[in-house]
């Protein structure tokens, strides 16, 4: 009698195992797009309000690096810019006297020409005024050339300083630490009053609303799977607690890899599998690293 009970128990266990195997087509773990935010400036970290578990929207400022030296440098460059602009010549005012002389000489030349026609002046007087006008016009051309060269040189200096100001403003902007995506802080790597250097990790953030299940398929399953297909995803909360979600296949690996030890497939003989990523809208219950199952 005891042997019969043992046989029935083993048979029930076998049937249960076989039945559960058909409940899913693939397994995997949940992951998200994680971004490690690093410092883009060097200086004392004034504050970093990015604690683990906090949620932020894209662009929110969460930290600040010392900006005093950069601010002073910007003020210096602005003063330099003002000095350069003050040296810029007023061309109209500086050539006004020469143009007035040319106008006067032109009137005298015209008067002498009229007198010459009336035989009240001689030719030499007209030639003298023509010569005087030529001298004044050459003088005006020289002034315009000199003032133009000076203006061009000052414009180049002004442009150079403006570029330096833009560089400092960009560096100042990088002292303000912002979050790059809508997401949740997963880890914090720095604290206020520490020295931040370019490239030093400050915190890690992930988009926990739009996550992925990385599952693994055998080659025989690839025929029935296409990008964009909707599938049923089960989040495994342990103790046989499964919650189903709708997912969409967004990526299929182009090459096979050896089956990860923690992954089960519907073909235990398969030693190579293809990874797929299934996009899932998280309702807040799915955690990173949690196991999941897929039904096509």
Name each model-derived stretch.
Residues 29, 45-51, 55-61, 167-171, ...:
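Surface-exposed patches in structured soluble domains
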Residues 217-243, 270-294:
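Surface-exposed connector loops and short turns at secondary-structure junctions
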Residues 38, 255-266:
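Short, solvent-exposed secondary-structure boundary/capping segments
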Residues 23-25, 72, 76-87, 93, ...:
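Extended amphipathic alpha-helical segments
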Residues 23-25, 178-179, 235-246:
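Short coil-to-beta-strand transition motifs
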Residues 14-17:
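C-terminal motif of bacterial Sec signal peptides marking the signal peptidase cleavage site
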Residues 23-87, 118, 124, 188-191, ...:
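Long, amphipathic coiled-coil "stalk"/hairpin helices in large membrane-associated assemblies
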Residues 2-12:
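Sec-dependent signal peptide recognition
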